[in-house]
Amino acid sequence: NTMGISTPIFSPTGNIKKSANDLAKYMIMHSQLGKYEGGRIIPKKLSQQMQAIISEEEGYGMALENTTQLIAGKTMIGHTGSAYGLYSMLFFEPKEKIGFVVISNGCDTKTINGFNAVLHQTVNSLYNNLIR
């Protein structure tokens, strides 16, 4: 691993070190604009701001990305992560109420449309075999 490449100089995880289950809860909360299990976790306006595109070139808002490059025909909102041989992503489509959290270990750096190839293929396999 090269400092600043596979692990940014500051915390590579934004100091979020969570399980797949915890990431799924975070994803559900954002897909419901700040609500989770009937309670408000963050203000609706804040969740909307975090999801709003600030950088048109990259599709990023404040921590969350909008992309059409993950699943064909879908605009997904989410975030990727990588550090020390771990690759992860959480992405959701709020209108259809679908979402994915995928975590993998390894050092495969191949990409598809800018996403780790293993994660991209896994999300598409889950979508095609379980949802579509």
Model-inferred region functions:
Residues N1-R132:
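Catalytic loop of the DD-peptidase/beta-lactamase superfamily, centered on the K-T-G motif
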